[in-house]
UniProtKB/Swiss-Prot annotation:
EC nos: 2.7.7.89, 2.7.7.42
Record's keyword annotation contains Transferase: yes
UniProt xrefs under SUPFAM superfamilies: Nucleotidyltransferase, Nucleotidyltransferase substrate binding subunit/domain
Function description: Involved in the regulation of glutamine synthetase GlnA, a key enzyme in the process to assimilate ammonia. When cellular nitrogen levels are high, the C-terminal adenylyl transferase (AT) inactivates GlnA by covalent transfer of an adenylyl group from ATP to specific tyrosine residue of GlnA, thus reducing its activity. Conversely, when nitrogen levels are low, the N-terminal adenylyl removase (AR) activates GlnA by removing the adenylyl group by phosphorolysis, increasing its activity.
Record family assignment: Belongs to the GlnE family.
Region (Adenylyl removase): 1-457
Swiss-Prot/TrEMBL keywords: ATP-binding, Magnesium, Multifunctional enzyme, Nucleotide-binding, Nucleotidyltransferase, Transferase
Name of the protein described by the UniProt record: Bifunctional glutamine synthetase adenylyltransferase/adenylyl-removing enzyme
GO CC terms in record: cytosol
Family annotation (Pfam families): GlnD_UR_UTase (PF08335), GlnE (PF03710)
Length: 977
């Protein structure tokens, strides 16, 4: 937000103008070189404004008028600093010092100069909030680091150079800036929260009496604090607060990296995670500091969803509220209701919960985090806009308060003069107008805070608990079994005894018996909510049957229970999906990270289109270092699991029809294959260099992945494997251009192996896909990757008719466009050749008969016996006569038989559009083509439903009886047997 320029001074402040002008006149009286008459009218006006608002600036101008004149003369009050300019000034000041006393004096004078400049630009609105905070933070960074760089060599001269035991290298200290300093958000009168560390234990060298590294850096840290913190006649540089270090004031001033890691791993508390979010290396050894932060990252950002963070933030807020009440600090704009801290808590709640998986949230500045929360869909744009504007208003107010006397306070002033100063700086004519606006923003912030952080057990307006309380006695066995059974029955359970047995089984399971106290408390809070929502369903028995195994699976990671406790909507969606599909229940039990997807209802039931899918996955992977294969593989699997769930949820809810379900699942696989190929290509090229084509040009990649079967035909279902074929156009004899060259044939074989490895390897998040490569030339005995020429020769000279049938559904998925276009030409040429139709019908019929005999229902002779349509007899939707495969074979027969004269048939690889093409070309009666399309979709829809119920694709033979007879009729009319 931009504040209005300060207008005329209010009446309350007018007397100060005359006083201040007299003060500055008196101050320059003894300095003939300083001429007030040389000031421009603008400078006079600005001085009147700034001095009226800030007693600190006035007193500094009185003590050091030359400092103000120099700033005016240099133009520094009218412009923002160039990058590095402020640091350069502080460095020159520090380096000029000849003693520690002079260092301290120089730094304090430099700080006063910058403070005057920053407040001047802030009050006159020449600097926006971001510039003010950045300049203050840059000032702190420079002061800390330049003081350290001045002190370190002198400390080494006195006590020796610290050497690491392990590396044998000189050691430097690492200074972490926490809180607002770490986030580059310092206010006008901030203290600075620091943590000191050093890489390795060891001793100093180069002096007679060596020091332990710990002692060396402790003494150095003390000298650094002394250079910055004490108040002298020149003021102070920054107040230094070291209480955020391990063990607080009772802990060692400096710790080794190992000790820091051990502490946070074993004893780190929730509030320390919150504090560490903003940690930044502000001084000392930057490279070592980056290593330290990488070591501590797992402590801050958990790799699973961590809704326990909300509990911790809620507890912290309660402690703050108690302190606010105790000290009468309701008017504190930082800690009071709707204050700065609440905005920070909102942002950091999302960071702590989701930051382990969403790397875009691993950043420090609050406004950038808010922008990410909006961009990634965690918070609506309107909410973020209010939080941003309210936060900026509070920060401007904070600066106006602190500018008065350079005091670290966020309390609204009580005196009339200071109130007038704050209102004036914020652009209001009077205190009441300002205060009304302030309370508006505090109200909005507090409302949003309660939406995110509020305790679900808070009472509603009528003083009743929201959900679950009536089920606590049953879960905690505070009532006898008869009463518990009666409560369940009255609530809608058909089998209350079985429900009690299931709950007892959960209660006594090994996983729950070994739970820690906090986990058990979370479970006890969750189960009553689960029961309260289960009885809202038509079949609560089924809900309990499917959800309790999931609860048992995630109970040891009780943060997932917190997620569902904190988010009643997510729990409601979980029960709905599990009631509808045991497949979904099993997926979530196996991969609890999917619970994250239940949080956003709009996102859950609206999967993205193909371009958005590809873009989202690309963006996720770009946030992961290129050499972190484990994280890349996990990210791919998380992506697949999450989007598969979204598709299934959309299908169950009726938001997606069958054809769209297959489209989305196919697009998902294509997006994943595209990134898997890119990863495998980078890894293989890094090892061996790039392969070459026969003309000497480099392949980039000169490789394509062909999808066959359901993948090629855009008909993927839940749990489908991928039928793939790999093709390249490299010169098999030419070598790659890397340090470890191999011939192109070997290169592409290794590339193919790498792709399969990335797709099929089991990790904690499962595998991406099962891959079937048996449709490649010569099947399982053939080369893993074929050259395009070899593929064409095989298809022309050696392939069986069933392989040409499979080629009808073959489609380029990802890879080199040039090779893909060449493949399409080969496919059209092979499939479009003239054929002996009688021979073709015989071969297609023979292959279909073999499949029916081997895979169909034995009891009905694969749907051809007299009992094939009887109720109670099984019908295999896919394999039996009149089913899916019959329709697929008819489509493939038609494509092979007629594409020579009607090449448009080959434009498509999916059965629906090929049938449409056959109808338009009058190769099949319209009524038959329409019937086959509708029956095919009905069969596939039934198969999808069976899959979501974790059942085989077998239904009662009485279903689809008429449709199957019609399919068999058309089969016969095509001359197939």
């Amino acid at each position: 937000m931009r504040l209005p320029l300060p207008s005329d001074l209010p009446a309350t402040l007018q007397p100060l103008v005359t006083r201040n002008q007299q003060f500055i006149s008196d101050a320059v009286a003894g300095h003939p070189e300083l001429d007030l008459q040389a000031w421009s009218p603008l400078h006079r006006q600005q001085f009147d404004q700034v001095a009226a608002a800030s007693e600190f600036v006035l007193s500094l101008a009185q003590r050091e008028p030359a400092m103000l004149f120099a700033l005016l003369a240099s133009g520094e009050l009218e412009r923002r600093y160039a990058p590095g300019e402020l640091r350069g000034q502080i460095a020159a000041t520090a380096q000029a010092a000849q003693s520690e006393d002079e260092l301290a004096r120089n730094l304090r004078r430099a700080r006063n100069r910058q403070q005057l400049r920053i407040i001047w630009r802030d009050i006159t609105r020449q600097a926006e909030l971001g510039e003010t905070c950045r300049d203050l933070s840059d000032l702190a960074d420079a002061a800390i680091d330049e003081a350290y760089q001045w002190l370190y060599p002198r400390h080494c001269q006195q006590f020796g150079t610290p050497i690491g035991n392990r590396s044998g290298q000189p050691q430097h200290m690492v200074v972490l800036g926490m809180g607002k300093l770490g986030a580059v958000e310092l206010n006008l009168s901030s203290d600075i929260d620091l943590i000191f560390g050093f890489p390795e234990g060891g001793e100093t060298e180069g002096v007679k009496r060596s020091l332990d590294n710990q002692e060396f850096f402790t003494r150095l840290g003390q000298r650094l604090i002394k250079a910055l913190d004490p108040v002298t006649v020149d003021g102070f540089v920054f107040r230094v607060d070291m209480r955020l270090r391990p063990y607080g004031s009772a802990g060692a001033l400096v710790l080794s990296f190992n000790a820091l890691e051990q502490y946070y791993q074993d004893q780190g508390r929730d509030w320390e995670r919150y504090a560490m979010i903003k940690a930044r290396v502000v001084a000392g050894d930057q490279a070592a500091g980056a290593q330290l932060q990488e070591m501590l990252r797992p402590f801050v950002y958990r790799r699973y969803l961590d809704f326990s963070a909300i509990e911790a933030l809620r507890t912290m807020k309660q402690l703050i509220q108690q302190e606010v009440r105790r000290k009468g600090m309701a008017e504190n704009i930082k800690l009071g209701a709707g204050g700065i801290r609440e905005v920070e808590f909102i942002a950091q709640a999302f960071q702590l919960i989701h930051g382990g998986r969403d790397l875009s949230l691993q950043q420090r500045p609050l406004l950038k985090v808010l922008a990410t929360l909006e961009g990634q869909g965690y918070l609506p744009p309107a909410v973020v806009a209010e939080l941003r504007e309210g936060y900026e208003f509070l920060r401007y107010t904070e600066h106006a308060i602190q500018a008065i006397a350079d005091r670290q306070t966020q309390m609204l002033p009580e005196g009339e003069t200071d109130q007038a100063r704050v209102a004036y700086v914020l652009g209001f004519a009077d205190w009441q107008s300002f205060h009304d606006q302030l309370m508006y923003w505090r109200g909005r912030i507090d409302w949003h805070f309660r939406q995110v952080i509020a305790d679900p057990d808070d009472e509603d307006g009528e003083g009743e608990l929201v959900v679950g309380g009536e089920w606590s006695p049953l879960w905690e066995q505070a009532q006898d079994e008869e009463a518990a059974g009666r409560q369940l029955q009255e609530a809608g359970f058909k089998q209350p005894a079985e429900a009690l047995r299931r709950l007892a089984g959960l209660r006594s399971s090994p996983q729950l018996r070994s739970m820690q106290r906090i986990g058990r408390e979370r479970l006890d809070a969750f189960i009553p909510r689960l029961l309260a929502q289960a009885v809202e369903h038509d079949n609560p028995d089924l809900v309990l049957e499917r959800v309790l195994p999931l609860v048992e699976a995630v109970a040891r990671r009780s943060a997932y229970l917190v997620l569902l406790t904190e988010n009643p909507g997510a729990l409601r969606r979980l029960l709905t999906l599990c009631a509808a599909s045991p497949w979904i229940a099993e997926q979530i039990a196996l991969y609890p990270l999917l619970l994250d997807e239940l949080l956003n209802e709009g996102r859950l039931f609206s999967p993205p289109l193909a371009p958005e899918l590809a873009s989202e996955l690309r963006e996720r992977l770009t946030r992961i270092p290129e050499d972190d294969l484990e994280q890349q593989m996990e990210a791919l699997r998380h992506f697949k699991l999450a989007h598969s769930l979204r598709v299934a949820a959309s299908e169950i809810s009726g938001n997606l029809p069958l054809m769209k379900v297959s489209d989305y699942l196919t697009w998902l696989a294509e997006a994943i294959l595209d990134q898997v190929l890119a990863l495998a290509w980078r890894q293989t090229v890094a090892r061996h260099g790039q392969p070459k084509r026969s003309d000497g040009s480099l392949c980039d990649p000169g490789f394509i992945i062909i999808g066959y079967g359901k993948m090629g035909g855009l008909e993927l279902g839940h749990g489908s494997d991928l039928d793939l074929v790999f093709i390249h156009d490299g010169d098999p004899q030419a070598e790659t251009d890397g340090a470890k060259p191999i011939d192109s044939a070997q290169f592409f074989t290794r590339l193919g192996q790498r792709i399969i490895h990335l797709l099929t390897t089991q990790t904690n998040s499962g595998q991406l896909y099962d891959v079937d490569m048996r449709l490649r030339p010569s099947g399982a005995s053939g080369l893993l990757v074929s050259s395009l020429g070899a593929f064409e020769r095989y298809q022309q000279n050696e392939a069986w008719t069933w392989e040409h049938q499979a080629l009808v559904r073959a489609r380029v998925l990802v890879g080199c466009k040039q090779v893909g276009a060449a493949f399409e030409g080969v496919r059209a040429k092979v499939l479009g050749q003239a054929r002996d139709l009688e021979k073709l019908r015989g071969e297609v019929s023979e292959m279909r008969a073999k499949m029916r005999d081997n895979l169909g229902t034995k009891a009905t002779a694969a749907g051809t016996a007299a009992n094939a349509f009887d109720a109670g007899v099984p019908f295999d939707i896919k394999q039996d006569a009149g089913g899916i495969v019959d329709i697929e074979f008819m489509v493939q027969y038609a494509a092979l038989a007629w594409s020579h004269d009607h090449p448009a048939i080959l434009r498509w690889t999916d059965n629906i559009r090929i049938l449409e093409e056959l109808e338009q070309a009058n190769l099949m009666p319209a009524s038959d083509a329409v019937l086959l399309r509708e029956v095919y979709k009905a069969f596939r829809s039934a198969s999808h439903r069976q899959a979501l119920q974790k059942e085989a694709g077998v239904i009662d033979a009485a279903q689809f009886a008429d449709e199957r007879r019609e399919v068999r009729r058309i089969w016969g009319e095509l001359g197939l047997s």
